[in-house]
């Protein structure tokens, strides 16, 4: 399965979440670290859903950048 993740930069670190997996979040000091942490968080989240016999959502979210004149 593939899931889109959203990475946001904040003061001193990065955070990320998965729109298709509510509650699945991660942080890291660098963009690479938060991406690695998010990968582990997704695996753990999906495993937890499976262990609890809950449905595992499919990845539907996508992202696109829009250019605007400021």
What is each stretch, according to the model?
Residues 7-21:
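Short aromatic-glycine-(Arg/Gly/Cys) micro-motifs in beta-strand/loop hairpins
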Residues 20-23, 58:
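Hydrophobic residues in alpha-helical membrane-spanning segments
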Residues 22-32:
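A short, exposed loop/beta-hairpin motif centered on an aromatic-Gly-Thr core
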